[in-house]
Design a protein with these regions (language model features):
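Conserved acetyl-CoA-binding loop-helix of GNAT-fold acetyltransferases
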Residues: 99-114, 252-255, 261-274, 278, ...
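Conserved donor-binding loop and adjoining core beta-sheet/short helix segment
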Residues: 23-24, 28-107, 223, 228-251
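A short beta-loop-alpha structural element at the N-terminal edge
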Residues: 2-19, 24-30, 164-187
Length: 324
């Protein structure tokens, strides 16, 4: 069959939305924690339109008039990294009946990325739903796993730890900033090797004041009279197709190095989930770097089920064909 690739526009958006809904329904059979709203084709088309309205462009690949892949992209810039291409989960899907979608994705990604590469955009970060055949196809195309998104029900928990947890007030924002900096600097350690970040504490405090003003809740853990841990509860999903929007999402979280292994993190998570349950929320979600030797086992052991992944492809055109 001939693969036809068209722009995502008013003539293709409904077919693309129907494809995302088909893939999402198939994924929810394996991972019921995924948001149910993306089972609906109209909701998926509306999400695609929101991407279009925020400077994303996209392509729809079809065989015999039926969409088999949709992929969208927007170029963004972040300090310490520069320009990169963002490919969001609500703008990416593959026909679930395809046994091996590598060829379809290769054609669509090639057409989408070629003009960006010509402009010097060499870093591509794609977020996708957790389906093994999609993971394998993206690996075949040179993408490597970078992050994971996990969800679990908000069911009240009891904690018997000696760690005390309180909700931070405005007077605690300097403590929040100090603990948030611990997390940021940990990411530059092996084996993550992220660029070192050392923003002024005043800037971090202002950032977290903004989160608090927008409804975020900061939980502080105290051990032996000392504030040693932070967990931030936000209500804005970083990936609405994976983490339910309007439901608690765990943001910046940290434990001081000398307090690790003493139940601080688990007590904070128990408190966050209990807070979510007490406020009549159904779900709580988190994202974490899979290379982080502290985060990955911690969040999995805390009961979060991976529902999607962020994968990265960094093009080094000078090294092509030089390995092996």
């Amino acid at each position: 069959m001939t693969l036809v690739i068209d722009d995502l526009d008013d003539t293709t958006i409904e077919r693309a939305g129907a494809l995302i809904a088909r893939e999402h329904a198939a994924a929810r059979q394996l991972r019921p924690e995924l948001p149910a709203g993306f089972d609906d084709a109209q909701a998926c088309a509306a999400a695609l339109q929101r991407l279009r309205d925020s400077d994303h462009r996209g392509l729809v690949a079809a065989e015999e008039g039926r969409a088999v892949a949709v992929i969208t992209v927007a170029v963004r810039e972040v300090g310490g990294i520069g320009r990169y291409a963002s490919l969001r989960a609500e703008g990416f899907a593959v026909e679930p009946s395809l046994a091996d979608p590598t060829g379809v994705l290769a054609a669509a990604f090639g057409d989408l990325a070629s003009p960006l590469i010509a402009e010097g955009v060499l870093r591509y970060y794609l977020v996708h739903i957790a389906l093994s055949r999609v993971e394998e196809a993206l690996s075949n195309l040179g993408f490597g796993r970078h992050g994971a998104y996990g969800v679990q029900p908000a069911v009240a928990r009891r904690s018997s730890s000696a760690v005390a947890v309180r909700i931070a007030g405005a007077e605690d924002l300097n403590t929040v900033a100090r603990l948030a900096l611990v997390e940021m600097q940990h990411r530059s350690a092996a084996p993550m090797f992220a660029p070192l970040q050392d923003p002024p504490l005043a800037d971090l405090a202002a950032r977290h004041r903004g989160l608090r003003d927008n409804g975020a809740v900061h939980l502080l853990a105290t051990l032996e009279g000392r504030d040693v841990g932070l967990l931030t509860i936000e209500l804005t999903s970083p990936a609405p197709r994976l983490c339910p929007d309007g439901q608690p999402y765990i943001g910046p979280t940290a434990t001081l190095p000398d307090a690790r292994g003493r139940g601080v993190g688990h007590t904070l998570v128990d408190a966050a989930i209990t807070w979510a349950h007490a406020h009549d929320y159904q779900w709580i979600s988190v994202d974490f770097e899979t290379a982080n030797p502290l985060s990955r086992p911690f969040w999995l052991n805390a009961g979060f089920c991976p529902v999607g992944y962020g994968v990265l492809r960094l093009l080094d055109r000078g090294a092509a064909g030089q390995f092996g």
